[in-house]
């Protein structure tokens, strides 16, 4: 599995932003499942999922 993302520390808050396919962010159940699967790689931090629409505009969840 290849994960494309970053761990960011902003104003003392550490979180992860992970790029996923748009199909992952279309359904709440898939977002929850994906966050759960990624939690082992990013313990004890919030995980933000980022996908892009057809025009390349990023959306964060």
Regions found by a protein language model. Give the residues of each.
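A cross-kingdom feature that marks ATP-driven nucleic-acid transaction machinery
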Residues: 1-61
């Amino acid at each position: 599995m290849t994960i494309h993302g970053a761990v960011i520390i902003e104003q003392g808050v550490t979180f992860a932003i992970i790029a996923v396919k748009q199909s992952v962010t279309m359904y709440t159940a898939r977002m929850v499942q994906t966050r759960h699967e990624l939690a082992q790689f990013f313990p004890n931090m919030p995980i933000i999922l980022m996908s892009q629409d057809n025009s390349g505009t990023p959306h964060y969840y």
